[in-house]
């Protein structure tokens, strides 16, 4: 990892937890040592964004897990970037594979959400990744480049964007991409940014890995030159999340 890219660890709590056990988790995180050169962000369920922001130390930022592409309106069940900011959160996760594949969000919609969230001043954790059949068909690059292009077309300022590579076959399955597999895709993504955006953006943009990251797998993954951090699912609800935060130490 280049010295200019601050290590980034995001915890995606998904649709898990209640105030009692999330409060206990927050107590653990507040007591944890967060290295000065590591940025930590937690994404609680929407109902608990306010709760998490009030309870978490300032050293840990808060993200929403999703948002819509407009400011206000008749969009039952949706939240806007302005609402997210009003609750004290500063980031949003967009394009997660569960949004794409469970809820049918298109590349186009994700791109529109990215544009609106950035325009409203949120940082964006933009997720991309291939399914198992796509990897086995040898089209990983094609899939992730297409997804990245739609995101890139909607980004003016890359300083507020973290790109999260999450191979869909490794999310919640216990299968982790090997450090070499992760590095290979991250390196190609950085190459794509260099060719299609700019060398400066390629060098400065953090590309993080997601997909069954645990306390046991994080150190070797973190040692790869183009792996700039993690987006963590299940393990972010456990005390081992502290080990992942300290993966570079």
Swiss-Prot record:
SUPFAM superfamilies referenced in this protein's UniProt entry, alphabetically: Triosephosphate isomerase (TIM)
Primary location class: cytoplasm
Identification of the protein by name: Triosephosphate isomerase
InterPro entries given in the database record: Aldolase_TIM, TIM_sf, TrioseP_Isoase_bac/euk, Triosephosphate_isomerase, Triosephosphate_isomerase_AS
Places the protein is found: Cytoplasm
Subunit structure: Homodimer.
Cleaved signal peptide residues: none
UniProt similarity note: Belongs to the triosephosphate isomerase family.
Annotated positions of the N6-succinyllysine modification: 149, 156, 194
Listed pathway(s): Carbohydrate degradation; glycolysis; D-glyceraldehyde 3-phosphate from glycerone phosphate: step 1/1; Carbohydrate biosynthesis; gluconeogenesis
GO cellular component: cytosol
Summary of the function given for this chain in its UniProt record: Triosephosphate isomerase is an extremely efficient metabolic enzyme that catalyzes the interconversion between dihydroxyacetone phosphate (DHAP) and D-glyceraldehyde-3-phosphate (G3P) in glycolysis and gluconeogenesis. It is also responsible for the non-negligible production of methylglyoxal a reactive cytotoxic side-product that modifies and can alter proteins, DNA and lipids.
Keywords for this protein: Acetylation, Cytoplasm, Gluconeogenesis, Glycolysis, Isomerase, Isopeptide bond, Lyase, Methylation, Nitration, Phosphoprotein, Ubl conjugation
Sites bearing N6-methyllysine, chain numbering: 194
List of residues that carry 3'-nitrotyrosine: 68, 209
UniProt: substrate binding residues: 12, 14
Catalytic residues of the enzyme: 96 (electrophile), 166 (proton acceptor)
């Amino acid at each position: 990892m280049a010295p200019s890219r601050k290590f980034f660890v995001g915890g995606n709590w998904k649709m898990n937890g209640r105030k009692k056990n999330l409060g206990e988790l927050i107590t653990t995180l507040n007591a944890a040592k967060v290295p000065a050169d590591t940025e930590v962000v937690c994404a609680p369920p929407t109902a608990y964004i306010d709760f998490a922001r009030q309870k978490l130390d300032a050293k840990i930022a808060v993200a929403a897990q999703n948002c819509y592409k407009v400011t206000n309106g008749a969009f039952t069940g949706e939240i806007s970037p302005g609402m997210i900011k009003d609750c004290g959160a500063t980031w949003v996760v967009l394009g997660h594979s569960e949004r794409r594949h469970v809820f049918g969000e298109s590349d186009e919609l994700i791109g529109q959400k990215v544009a609106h969230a950035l325009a409203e001043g949120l940082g964006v954790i933009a997720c991309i990744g291939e399914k198992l059949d796509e990897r086995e068909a040898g089209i990983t690059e094609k899939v992730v480049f297409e997804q990245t292009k739609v995101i890139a077309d909607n980004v003016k300022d890359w300083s507020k964007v973290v790109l999260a590579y999450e191979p869909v076959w490794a999310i919640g399955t216990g299968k982790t991409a090997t450090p070499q597999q992760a590095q290979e895709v991250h390196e190609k993504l950085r190459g794509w940014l260099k060719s299609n955006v700019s060398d400066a953006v390629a060098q400065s943009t953090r590309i993080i890995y997601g997909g069954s990251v645990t306390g046991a797998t994080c150190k070797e993954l973190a040692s790869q030159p183009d792996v700039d951090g993690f987006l963590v699912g299940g393990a972010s609800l456990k005390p081992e999340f502290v080990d992942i935060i300290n993966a570079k130490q």
